[in-house]
A protein has these predicted regions:
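N-terminal subdomain of nucleotide-sugar transferases
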Residues: 1-52
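Structural motif
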Residues: 3, 106-107, 165
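Conserved nucleotide-sugar phosphate-binding/catalytic loop shared by glycosyltransferases and other
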Residues: 33-87
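Generic beta-sheet signal
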Residues: 38, 59, 130-131, 169, ...
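Short, polar loop motifs at secondary-structure junctions
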Residues: 39-44, 112-115, 168-174
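Short loop/helix-cap segments at secondary-structure boundaries that form the rim of catalytic
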Residues: 44-52, 117-122, 173-181
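Conserved nucleotide-sugar donor-interacting segment of glycosyltransferase catalytic cores
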Residues: 96-157
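A nucleotide-sugar donor-handling region in carbohydrate enzymes
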Residues: 139-207
Length: 207
């Protein structure tokens, strides 16, 4: 593998926090690996977490859920956004597949945009999904089972199931509709002891 394409959701920074340690460790074993990261997150923040060279394409690959604030979901706006996002779904996946073909990756790692996975499948590019959650289950929680959402309820898990494997990081959602999951323990950046800096910032003495 020479070129890894990494698609990261920017719905909060937790997706980056899960993905960055994997990339940092992978680069230690494969220092010649070319990494392309596509995410709507700021480049400066990505560089704080991803400590190896990478090329950043600043684009939004999904939107997760529309939010009032950090914890409250704007359900009507979210459902409307999903209907718009999935309109003409087949064409959109084909367009994304063309973009991916131009990038020529050997593997896609997605945390956890799903259109990317569907496009990779169409283009014949191996793919791995990795996260503690997926938008299929979250959408199902909020969206009614009606004619307007039936296609979306099918397309979301189909996209995730198209990956070779979905690495389900603990603690995770159940993901009963996904048939390619493999459970892993949690992934996180290892901390560094900075006792003196902490004392200085807090104005605390060493005693």
């Amino acid at each position: 593998m020479k070129h890894l394409l990494v698609d990261i959701s920017a719905h909060g920074f937790g997706h980056i926090a899960q993905t960055a340690p994997v990339l940092n460790l992978l680069a230690q074993h494969r220092p010649d690996l070319r990494i392309t990261v596509r995410s709507h997150a700021p480049t400066e923040y990505l560089k704080q977490r991803i400590l190896v060279p990478f090329e950043h394409h600043h684009i939004a690959l999904d939107f997760g859920m529309a939010m009032f604030d950090a914890i409250r979901v704007d359900v009507p706006r979210s459902l409307a956004a999903y209907r718009d996002y999935h309109a003409d779904w087949t064409r959109k996946v084909a367009t994304e597949a063309e973009v991916m073909r131009a990038l020529q990756p050997d593997l896609l790692l997605a945390n956890v945009p799903y259109k990317s996975l569907a496009a990779a499948k169409l283009e014949g590019i191996p793919s791995v999904a990795m996260c503690c959650l997926n938008w299929a289950d979250i959408y199902r929680h909020y969206a009614p089972e009606d004619a307007g959402s039936a296609a979306i309820h099918a397309q979301l898990p189909d996209a995730y199931n198209s990956a070779e494997v979905f690495l389900k990081l603990s603690p995770a959602m159940p993901m009963h509709d996904l048939h390619n999951t493999r459970e892993l323990s949690c992934v996180a950046q290892t901390g560094v002891a900075r006792r003196e800096l902490l004392r200085a910032r807090c104005g605390a003495s060493a005693q």
